[in-house]
Amino acid sequence: MHLRILGSAAGGRFPQWNCGCANCAGVRGNAGKNTGQHAFPGKARTQAQLALSADGISWFLAGASPDLASQIESTPALHPRARRDSPIAGVVLASADLDHVLGLLLLRELQPLRVYAAPSILRILREENSMFSMLNRADPQVIWTPIKSAAPFPLQDVAGNDLALCYELYPLGGRYPKYVRTKDLPPQDATSALFFTSKSVTSKTSKRIGYLPAVGKLDDALLSKLEGLDVLLLDGTFWSDDELSRLDPTAERAHQMGHISVEESLRLLKNINVRRRIYIHINNTNPILNEAGPEHRAVRDAGWEIAEDNWYLEL
């Protein structure tokens, strides 16, 4: 399986346009300067975005970030192969959060795609937001595909061809975005974990990736789902539960926003059997972005990696 991390920051990217915290001010000060001893020891990041493929030819996106256009341009594997073409076969959605779906509108140029999500997420996009009708100006353009079963589901292109890649939606619950007006949506579908499985034609072995950019808690059932993964990409939004409230007393705590803290997940997953453990969806205030800081060292010493834009993993 081929995995490309196109973006690794939480919503608002890093640096965030209206933030002057120590992290943002530091990385912003690096722009246009030669790296020196006074430079901020960290890297700018675009908003979290994955691309996955079984063969390195046809790709599926996990989410559709607001930075998607520039992320595609910086990734030659996702460039057109003909005058009007895209190797992107479709998109898999974990939620209706703006930083997870706005990039769909950047894919409106009449390119056939398949979009997979829980029925409630598709309902929000198709019935509550007229802008997304721009994705259905031609036939075929976007094929909206609801996933109701928790069983692994084969991903297909718009022609119905299986692409040797399966995925599974694992409901995490939580809350729907504040812009959602519909009140009768099932709470369990607000956020999902995404699990991808690929089988190699030559080795007959399966590879599994788990993508959880927003998870509020790690219960026993979820912990068992994570066991044995080849790659785990986990919610790294906040270092501590009170990260934002220490900066602004009126701000919510991490768990109230549906995010487990890195401090807590490090403890709970200390003995997890996962080949590679990577934190992603990192908020601009998170001290792990400072590569010289104790929090960054604590994560690395625990055997975890901290995702950066443009990483490529081949399993």
Where are the predicted features?
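Active-site neighborhood of phospho(di)ester-bond hydrolases with catalytic His/Asp-centered motifs
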Residues: L61-S65, P87-D99, A117-A118, I209-V215, ...
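Short glycine-/acidic-enriched loop or helix-start segments at secondary-structure transitions
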Residues: P15, Q71-E73, L102-L104, R126-E127, ...
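Short, conserved loop/helix-junction motifs that constitute active-site signature segments
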Residues: R83-S86, L107-Q111, N136-A138, K225-E227, ...
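Core dinuclear metal-dependent hydrolase active-site scaffold
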Residues: M1-A77, R81, P146-K225, W311-L315
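Residues at the starts of beta-strands that form the adenosine-phosphate
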Residues: H2, P112-R114, I143, C166, ...
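Long, hydrophobic, well-ordered secondary-structure blocks that form the structural core
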Residues: L107-S133, A138-W144
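Active-site metal-binding motif and surrounding structural segment of the metallo-beta-lactamase
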Residues: G56-A117
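Cap/insert and terminal regions of metallo-dependent hydrolase folds
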Residues: D189, S200-R208, V215-Y312
